[in-house]
Amino acid sequence: MNLQHHFLIAMPALQDPIFRRSVVYICEYNDEGAMGIIINKPLENLQVEGILEKLKIVPEPRNPEIRLDKPVMLGGPLAEDRGFILHTPPSDFSSSIRISDNTVITTSRDVLETLGTDRQPGNVLVALGYSSWEKGQLEQEILDNAWLTAPADQNILFRTPIADRWREAAKLIGIDIVTMPGVAGHA
């Protein structure tokens, strides 16, 4: 089982305040564990333009048709002061890792400098912090019915309204998660 470029979808019984009703995009999955970004938990009162202002980045030349008032996500409980940008190619920034044919993660300032300009990648999601699991930890959480998994979908990752991502991600595997009971058993 390789969960890279998959969604983790929190089961209704998962009540952890950070992960409750969350969708996590898995960026890396290997023998050492997993790393992902929550894609549906916007930080209060923080938008992309606020990050750019804080870092003194002025988009040049500014394309007014590109909106910078998109919310910044809480990517997870670790390194909440560190930025992670999920985007579509190109991946020619100084700290980019290609996750799939159409998804890249970048942690360097140079991608931020393209936001709001014609050089910006087509789709962008900005997050602060990340989520991580040690070897075997995520697999155990899945066995314990904390998570569903589904192949990642670009539309949900970048375009689906944030409030709908949990429900829509579950629909990828034919589940109406809103009507699912809070406690599941093993068959």
From Swiss-Prot:
The family classification in the record reads: Belongs to the UPF0301 (AlgH) family.
A Pfam family per the record: DUF179
Q: Which GO terms describe its cellular component?
A: cytosol
Supply the InterPro entries for this chain: AlgH-like (IPR003774)
Name of the protein: UPF0301 protein KPN78578_33170
Q: Which organism is it from?
A: Klebsiella pneumoniae subsp. pneumoniae (strain ATCC 700721 / MGH 78578)
